C-alpha cells in the first residue's frame, strides 16, 4: 500500500511541473549554428564548447546554452550543423556590446573560425 501511495504521489507531483515563462519583452536571443571543418570531431567540439563556456561571464548575457543537432528525416529540419549556440541577452544594446567585447572576438578569432567552415547567425527579439 505504501508503494502504491508513493507512486501516486510521484505521478501527481510530476504533473505539477511547469515550463519557464516567456522571456521578458526586449530580450534578444542570439542563435548561432556551427559546421565544423572536421564534422563530428569530438576534440574540436570540446574546444568549441569550452570557448562558448568562457563567454558566460560577459555582461548582458542572461542565459547561454549549446548542443548538437538532432537527426531528422523531416524536410523542414536542417540537421546539417554540428553545434548550436543559444545566448539570451537582456536587450539589443547588450547584444551589440557582446559583438565587440574583446573576450568574444578573441574566442571567434582563436577558436571558432579556425575550427569551423561555416557559421550562421539568427537574432530575434520580443
Model-found features: residue ranges?
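Short, exposed beta-strand-loop hairpins at the edges of beta-sheets
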Residues: 96-99, 109-116
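Positively charged n-region of N-terminal signal peptides that target proteins for export
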Residues: 1-4
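Bacterial N-terminal signal peptides
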Residues: 6-15
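Short S/T/G/P-rich N-terminal loop/turn motif that feeds into the first structured element of a domain
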Residues: 16-82, 86, 90-96, 124-126
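A generic structural signal for alpha->beta connector loops
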Residues: 61, 116-118
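Histidine-centered active-site/metal-ligand motif
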Residues: 30, 101-104
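Extracytoplasmic/secreted proteins, especially bacterial periplasmic and envelope-associated proteins
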Residues: 43, 47-50, 103, 107, ...
Amino acid at each position: 500500500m505504501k508503494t502504491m501511495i508513493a507512486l501516486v504521489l510521484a505521478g501527481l507531483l510530476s504533473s505539477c511541473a511547469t515550463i519557464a515563462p516567456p522571456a521578458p519583452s526586449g530580450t534578444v536571443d542570439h542563435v548561432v549554428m556551427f559546421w565544423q571543418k572536421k564534422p563530428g570531431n569530438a576534440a574540436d567540439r570540446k574546444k568549441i564548447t569550452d570557448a562558448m563556456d568562457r563567454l558566460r561571464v560577459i555582461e548582458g548575457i542572461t542565459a547561454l546554452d549549446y548542443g548538437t543537432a538532432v537527426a531528422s528525416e523531416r524536410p523542414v529540419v536542417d540537421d546539417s550543423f554540428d553545434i548550436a549556440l543559444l545566448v539570451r541577452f537582456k536587450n539589443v544594446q547588450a547584444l551589440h556590446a557582446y559583438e565587440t567585447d574583446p573576450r568574444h572576438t578573441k574566442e571567434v578569432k582563436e577558436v571558432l573560425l579556425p575550427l569551423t567552415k561555416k557559421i550562421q547567425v539568427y537574432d530575434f527579439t520580443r
